[in-house]
């Protein structure tokens, strides 16, 4: 008899889009941890930053080491795109870990993904 846990092991890899829209360090840290777990299981993961989510770098701490999670995610081939308008509204420049994108990029991530998670 198959258990629920063994059924999960048979799931094919998927494309996962994660939308970060807030600035709460713990929530963003957990979203990034999930993204890294999914990447480790062979899934393709992309993150779109919108609203306060574009400020995620500013909320790094010893307890919630967001920078470490981001480095791990990018090193594994993950993609991060930030809403360019949201960056502009906050007078924040794009960076290697927060590159500017457009609504077209957000739409592409959603339409090409098997699952979309929002945090």
What are these regions (language model features)?
Residues 88-119:
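C-terminal structural segments of small proteins and small subunits
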Residues 42, 77, 113-114:
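Short, well-ordered alpha-helix to beta-strand connector turns
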Residues 35, 45-51, 80-84:
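Short internal beta-strands
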Residues 16-29, 54-61:
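Short, glycine-rich nucleotide/cofactor-binding loops
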Residues 63-89:
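A glycine-rich helix N-cap at a beta->alpha junction
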Residues 27-42, 47:
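Histidine-anchored nucleotide/phosphate-binding helix
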Residues 32-33, 62-67, 99-102:
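Charged helix-capping and loop-helix junction motifs
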Residues 1-13:
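Short, Lys/Arg-enriched N-terminal segments with co-localized hydrophobic residues
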């Amino acid at each position: 008899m198959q258990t629920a846990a063994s059924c999960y092991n048979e799931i094919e890899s998927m494309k996962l889009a994660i939308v970060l829209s807030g600035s709460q360090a713990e929530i963003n840290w957990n979203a990034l941890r999930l993204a890294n777990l999914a990447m480790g299981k062979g899934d393709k993961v992309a993150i779109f930053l919108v609203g306060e989510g574009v400020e995620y770098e500013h909320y790094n701490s010893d307890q919630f080491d967001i920078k470490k999670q981001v480095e791990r995610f990018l090193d594994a081939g993950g993609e991060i795109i930030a809403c360019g308008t949201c960056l502009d509204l906050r007078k924040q420049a794009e960076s290697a870990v927060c590159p500017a994108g457009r609504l077209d990029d957000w739409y592409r991530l959603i339409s090409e993904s098997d699952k979309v998670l929002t945090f």
